Amino acid sequence: MANYRLSNEAKNDLIRIHQYGVRRFGITQADKYFNSFFECFELISQRPFSFESVSYIKKDYRRCVCGVDSIYFKINGNIIEIMAIVGRQDLNEKL
């Protein structure tokens, strides 16, 4: 099992997603959705190669779908680097 690390961009994405969730759905639902990302991060760290390669979007990236958002990550030895969490935004703008 690898460890995972969040990029600053991914941390900012989580904050943005949580704030949006609180405004749109309330704190309870926003917290549940926020916590689901960490469940996905654990799953990614356990089986990183089970997620699709999206090198056609960005070299060496893989994607895990979590709810309505996609987690983009890279495998760097024993570290999974969570690079960004993208929802309906333009991929070219975010990645």
Task: Map each language-model feature to its residues.
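Basic, Lys/Arg-enriched alpha-helical interface segments
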Residues: 1-57, 61
